Amino acid sequence: MNINNEIKYTEKYNYNIDESVGWMNTTDGALDNVGNLLGEIKETILKVGNGTYSQNEMKSLNEDMNEKIKQLADTLNSTHGGKYLFGGSSVDDAPITVIENPDGTVKLEFSKDKNGQTIPNTDDLKADISSGINIDYNISVGEILNIKDGNGNTVNLLDEINNLSTLMNDIANGDE
């Protein structure tokens, strides 16, 4: 290989490293925000559980919960360089859709493409960082939201969050 090709490849690898590090730093910040929002949602649930709030206060807590859920969706739809961080290899479309229902509940769904296929996937994004060496540098929303419980069963946090919105709405409206 001649020196010009070596320089070209080195520049490409340096670009890939810089881009991957930037992507991972943005991802790290977004995941911190996800953790903070889930903590705030937990705090709201604990407030509701103490049973000392008036109906108006419960409605306010419900509105607060719905705002946090929408903020969670916004965070899961974070971008770096115009590309969605958590869509797996589907970086051009937002992985989460927010549905605000007429009854006051907020529902989050995995987004779908024009053919009805779920957009976020678990395919990795890869970058060549040296000759013969590549790295995976992303995490998908499915990997974030599908967790294992104590028995090893998969729990979809999206379903749990949607159930919380419905439950909070029912409580705020005196249905529970």
For each feature predicted by the language model, list its residue ranges.
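Amphipathic alpha-helical polymerization modules
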Residues: 1-92, 169-176
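Bacterial flagellar/type III secretion structural subunits and associated motility module proteins
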Residues: 2-21, 28, 90-176
